[in-house]
Amino acid sequence: MRLKDHVAIVTGGGGAVGGGIATCLAQEGADIVVSDINLEAAEIRANKLKEIGRRVITVRSDITVEKDCQFLIQECLKSFGKIDILVNNAGHFGKRLGLPFTNQTEEEWDDNYNINVKGPFFLCKAVSSHMMERSFGKIINISSIAAKRDPQIVPAYAAGKNALLTLTRIVAKDLAPFNINVNAICPGMIWGEFWQRLAPLVAAGDDQFDASMDPRELFEAWVNKNAPFKREQTPEDIGNLAVFLSSKEARNITGQAIHVDGGMAM
């Protein structure tokens, strides 16, 4: 097990991608703090992780609130005594999709920025002193392929995820002297709540797709058209990369944004 005796925090751990990341880390030996604003979802995931044989706790946290982020770090230290890995996975697409930037509100942009950028900033800041004292740590920020393709139908989300990549490089440079690796993962096309909402908008904006198609069918058609590998990505794909970036094999990798997108951003 590559992560035996490691302790990892995964924010947004009650969701599909966060759950996949937490599961992969646990399968490689890490004990897990599942953090989510939805405590019930976090507890469901935690129960599954306990079946693997790991020690697991749940913490409800709103990452847009700095005190919540500090509390999350404190709860992990109280339960496990250390933090080896922080995965900033919690994110937000926005309440309204498919609008050009001219039709979006200041509130929508603030909402995206608070969750997708300020939340990871708060947590990187909160965990850094502990990791610096130990001269060890792995921080992984979950961005998106939207940061590289600049999709017009999610402008605030894409801008926020791009800002997260800049934050990743800044934090990586500051923490490198303390043997702390900081990287980002850019997931591609993963079926879930986002795509269930997005599929009709994609169909409406592309004559090659039939708007009457089932959202799942439309998603598969879009993947087939846009991904060179012509296959979707999974939460486990993201989790497997998170395991590698958390391992000693990745000790010389920092400040990078790695795509898991089937070649879509080439």
Model-found features: residue ranges?
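C-terminal substrate-recognition "lid" of short-chain dehydrogenase/reductases
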Residues: R2, F121, M132, F136, ...
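Canonical Rossmann dinucleotide-binding motif of NAD(H)/NADP(H)-dependent dehydrogenases/reductases
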Residues: L3-V33
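Substrate-binding pocket helix/loop in short-chain dehydrogenase/reductase
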Residues: C69, L97-F101, T105-D110, V223
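Active-site helix of classical SDR
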Residues: C124, G160, T168
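Alpha-helical segment proximal to the catalytic Tyr-Lys
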Residues: S129, K173-D174, R251
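Residue(s) in the substrate-gating loop at a strand-loop-helix junction
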Residues: S144
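Short, small/polar-rich loop/turn modules that mediate ligand/substrate recognition or access, typified
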Residues: A176, N181, I253-G255
